[in-house]
């Protein structure tokens, strides 16, 4: 096994990057969102506090459009996590023309509703992205 991971960088002609290595942690939870909401909010808060709230500038609204992640945007997304039966929350960093480094995404599912045809593969999913530089700075601890 190598001590170093491969650097994967595809440069644009303007000096930025289209592709950049990093780590994406996806958690698939076979539990109804109603049982997961508070734990997901704590996880989101822990992640945002660890990487810095300043790294997030937008959230994605119900139409799929980016909206400014100001105090009102934070409150709206927290309410969605706690009050909506199957929320979708996406937090993104400011668009700089570079690949995203920090990203949080959660898709809640109603897997406990007997009225809905539910696949055995359905689950709530939380995703946390970290750039390789963050991992190098903070080490394995």
Predicted regions and their residues:
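C-terminal interaction module
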Residues: 1-58, 140-141
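Internal, hydrophobic cores of structured domains that mediate oligomerization or house catalytic pockets
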Residues: 43-45, 50-140
